[in-house]
Amino acid sequence: MPHAEKGLTVGLFGGSFNPPHAGHALVAEIALRRLALDQLWWMVTPGNPLKSTRELAPLAERLQLSEQIARNPKIKVTAFEAAHHVRYTADTLALVKARNPGVDFVWIMGADSLRDFHRWQRWREIVLTFPIAVIDRPGATLSFLSSVVAKTFDYARIDEGDAPLLARMRAPAWTFIHGPRSSLSSSAIRKMAKG
């Protein structure tokens, strides 16, 4: 797990990154800038419990490719979930919080992930524990509004203009961040690679 000093603001950007691409790097850069973060931990997960592992590239390969794409020195690429045998995001976030007292974290996710977020194990616990930044993705700008999470926690949504304050806010708190979007997707890249 990367190190963060007390008082820092750190974004947590997790995913299978199968494969990582410039769109992921764009999300990371937008989050760093718009949330005024000191660091961003790019967390390459061993696998997504909601997705098939049939086409999942080896973790070492996804980790190496992520390091090549994430060039900003504020971005720390890690696969600590595998070392700690953590499978679910709620467990990962609990571990991160327990090991880093005094650090202000914000969970970062693409708007496309918000659609199914209510299917994640202990999703309410995640929302009630960590501020969340939802970054715009092509085709997901409007659908996020109808998501279970957006409806359930509409009262906790903060204005996008207040995004730099999010990491220091007490959960539940979340925002939707508009910005440049990349049409790249890992599933489309895998499909093209198959021919």
UniProtKB/Swiss-Prot annotation:
Pathway: Cofactor biosynthesis; NAD(+) biosynthesis; deamido-NAD(+) from nicotinate D-ribonucleotide: step 1/1. Its EC number is 2.7.7.18. InterPro entries: Cyt_trans-like, NadD/NMNAT, Rossmann-like_a/b/a_fold. CDD domains: NMNAT. The keyword NAD applies. Gene3D superfamilies: HUPs. It catalyses: nicotinate beta-D-ribonucleotide + ATP + H(+) = deamido-NAD(+) + diphosphate. GO terms for molecular function: ATP binding; nicotinate-nucleotide adenylyltransferase activity. GO terms for biological process: NAD biosynthetic process. Keywords: ATP-binding, NAD, Nucleotide-binding, Nucleotidyltransferase, Pyridine nucleotide biosynthesis, Transferase. It is an enzyme of class 2 (transferase). SUPFAM superfamilies: Nucleotidylyl transferase. NCBIfam families: nicotinate (nicotinamide) nucleotide adenylyltransferase, PRK00071.2-2, PRK00071.2-4. Belongs to the NadD family. Catalyzes the reversible adenylation of nicotinate mononucleotide (NaMN) to nicotinic acid adenine dinucleotide (NaAD). This is Probable nicotinate-nucleotide adenylyltransferase. It comes from Mesorhizobium japonicum (strain LMG 29417 / CECT 9101 / MAFF 303099) (Mesorhizobium loti (strain MAFF 303099)). The gene is nadD.
